A protein has these predicted regions:
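Short glycine/proline-enriched turns and hinge-like loops at secondary-structure junctions
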Residues: 64-65, 133-135, 159-163, 177-180, ...
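Flexible, small-/acidic-enriched active-site or ligand-binding loops
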Residues: 136, 191-220
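Flexible, glycine-rich active-site loops centered on histidine and acidic residues
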Residues: 95-101, 123, 135
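Conserved hydrophobic/aromatic beta-strand scaffold that supports enzyme active sites
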Residues: 122, 136-140, 147, 165-169, ...
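A short core secondary-structure module
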Residues: 146-147, 151-195
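A short, Trp-centered hydrophobic/proline-enriched beta-strand micro-motif
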Residues: 117-125
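Short Gly/Pro-enriched turn/cap motifs at secondary-structure boundaries
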Residues: 114, 129-132, 156-159, 173-175, ...
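Alpha-helical interface subdomain recognition
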Residues: 1-89, 101-106, 113-118, 131-134, ...
C-alpha cells in the first residue's frame, strides 16, 4: 500500500497545517468556552478548498483523494476538534452520499455549492429511540403526488442549524424493516422543517449539535436519494466512510495532546530536573506515541482501501475503534502529566480530553465497532 502524496498534495497539506496553526488554533479555546460555531473559520476553509477535498473538480471539489482529506481532518483536529468534526460531517456524511448515490441532476444541483463550502452539509439518522439500533427509525415519509411528506425528529445532528442541506433517513414502508428505510435530500428552507433544541455538550462544544424537527415537511420526489427502500444501505455505507474521518479526528486529538505533553515535560522541572528526564515519563511517552503511530497506519489503510474502491468496512471499524480509544488514553495521561495545571483551562489538554470522549461514541460506539469487526471475521 502506498500512502504517499503527490508533490501538489504535499503542498496543499502543508498549507492546511499552517492554516490550522495560524487561524484555527488561536480560536480553539474561545470557541470551546463560548460554545460558538466558528463560521469565520468555515468561510476561510471554503476559500482554501478544504470543504471539498476528495471530490472531482467538475463538481466543485479539490480533486484530492481520501488519504489527503483525512490527513487534513487530522491537522485541523490536532489544534481544534470542533473544526475537524465540522469538516468531517460535512464531507463524509453529506457530500459523499450525494456523490456516491445521487442522480446526475442531484449532483449538479447540490455538490458544487457543498464542495465549494458555499453551503454546509449534515446527516440525520439518530433518533430519540434509534441510536445504536439505527433500524428502529420512527421518522416516516409518505408519497403524495410529486412530493413526499416527512414527519418525525432527529437528535444529536452535527452542523444542524448551520447546514443548508441534510441527508435524512425515513421509513417509507414500516412493514419491511430496514428495507423500508429511504434517504432524502432535505434543504433547510423546505416547508415543515425546523431546528429544535441545541445540546450543551462535554466536548466539541463549538460544533452545533441540535434536534431536527419535521412536521409535514414537504420534500420533492426528485430529492429521494437512491431508490425507495435503499436508505439503510446508504446510511451504513455512509457511516463506513464517516468512521474513517472520525478516526482521523481522534488521531489528530491524540497527536495534539502528545505535542502539548512533550513540550510540557521538557519545560516542567521537579526535584531539580525536567519531567522528561525521568525514565517513567520516557517509557510512558514512548508507549503512547507508538500507539498513535499504530492508529495512524490503521486509518491510512482504511482511507487507502476506500480510494481503491475495495471493501473497507472492517478496516474503518478497526481504525475508529483503535484511534478513538488511543485518543482517550493519550489525553487522559496528558492531563495526568500536567498535574494540577492539566485540570485547568490554562492548558489545552483538558479540552482535548473532553473532545476525545465523543470519538468513542458517535458514528458508532466502540462496542458497535467491535460488533462489526467480529461479524466480518465470523461470517
Amino acid at each position: 500500500m502506498d500512502f504517499s502524496l503527490s508533490k501538489q498534495d504535499q503542498l496543499f497539506l502543508q498549507m492546511i497545517r499552517e492554516f490550522a496553526e495560524k487561524e484555527v488554533k488561536p480560536l480553539a479555546a474561545e470557541v470551546d468556552e463560548s460554545e460558538r460555531f466558528p463560521m469565520e473559520t468555515v468561510q476561510k476553509m471554503a476559500k482554501l478548498g478544504i470543504m471539498g477535498i476528495p471530490f472531482p473538480v467538475e463538481f466543485g471539489g479539490a480533486g484530492g483523494n481520501n488519504i489527503l482529506y483525512t490527513m487534513a481532518v487530522e491537522e485541523l483536529s490536532r489544534v481544534c476538534a470542533t473544526t475537524g468534526v465540522i469538516v468531517s460531517a460535512h464531507t463524509s456524511l453529506c457530500c459523499a452520499p450525494i456523490m456516491e448515490h445521487g442522480t446526475p441532476e442531484q449532483k449538479a444541483k447540490y455538490l458544487p455549492k457543498l464542495t465549494s463550502g458555499e453551503w454546509i452539509g449534515a446527516f440525520g439518522l439518530t433518533e430519540p429511540n434509534a441510536g445504536t439500533d439505527a433500524s428502529a427509525q420512527q421518522t416516516f415519509a409518505v408519497k403524495e403526488g410529486d412530493h413526499y411528506v416527512l414527519n418525525g425528529s432527529k437528535i444529536f445532528i452535527t452542523n444542524a442549524g448551520y447546514a443548508h442541506v441534510y441527508i435524512i433517513m425515513a421509513m417509507t414502508d414500516k412493514s419491511k424493516g430496514t428495507k423500508g428505510i429511504s434517504a432524502f435530500i432535505v434543504e433547510k428552507d423546505f416547508p415543515g422543517f425546523s431546528i429544535g433544541k441545541k445540546e450543551k455538550k462535554m466536548g466539541i462544544r463549538g460544533s452545533a449539535t441540535c434536534e431536527l424537527i419535521m412536521e409535514n415537511c414537504i420534500v420533492p420526489a426528485e430529492n429521494l436519494l437512491g431508490q425507495e427502500g435503499k436508505g439503510f444501505g446508504i446510511a451504513m455505507k455512509t457511516l463506513d466512510g464517516g468512521r474513517i474521518g472520525i478516526a482521523y479526528q481522534a488521531l489528530g486529538i491524540a497527536q495534539g495532546a502528545m505535542d502539548e505533553t512533550v513540550k510540557y515535560v521538557k519545560e516542567r522541572k521537579q526535584f531539580g530536573k525536567s519531567l522528561g528526564q525521568f525514565q517513567n515519563t520516557q517509557f510512558q511517552l514512548a508507549d503512547l506515541q507508538t500507539k498513535v503511530e499504530a492508529a495512524r497506519l490503521l486509518v491510512r489503510q482504511a482511507a487507502y482501501k476506500k480510494d481503491q474502491k475495495v471493501p473497507y468496512s472492517t478496516d474503518a471499524a478497526m481504525a475508529k475503534l483503535f484511534a478513538a480509544e488511543t485518543a482517550m488514553e493519550v489525553t487522559t495521561k496528558a492531563v495526568q502529566f500536567h498535574g494540577g495545571y492539566g485540570y485547568t483551562r490554562e492548558y489545552p489538554v483538558e479540552r482535548m480530553m473532553r473532545d476525545a470522549k465523543i470519538t468513542e461514541i458517535y458514528e458508532g460506539t466502540s462496542e458497535v465497532q467491535r460488533m462489526v469487526i467480529a461479524a466480518n471475521l465470523l461470517k
